[in-house]
Amino acid sequence: IKITTMLAKLGKVLAHV
């Protein structure tokens, strides 16, 4: 797993909320 992917996923989740 890449850290960038994790950050991107977290950012998307945060943006969604």
From Swiss-Prot:
Residue list for modification Valine amide: 17
Keywords, ordered alphabetically: Amidation, G-protein coupled receptor impairing toxin, Mast cell degranulation, Secreted, Toxin
Main subcellular location of this protein, as a coarse class: secreted
Domain of life: Eukaryota
Gene Ontology MF terms in the entry: toxin activity
Tissue: Expressed by the venom gland.
Pfam families, per database record: Bombolitin (PF08096)
GO cellular component, one term: extracellular region
Subcellular location(s) of the protein: Secreted
Function noted in UniProt: Mast cell degranulating peptide. Its mast cell degranulation activity may be related to the activation of G-protein coupled receptors in mast cells as well as interaction with other proteins located in cell endosomal membranes in the mast cells.
Family: Belongs to the MCD family. Bombolitin subfamily.
Record protein name field: Bombolitin-1
Organism: Bombus pensylvanicus (American bumblebee)
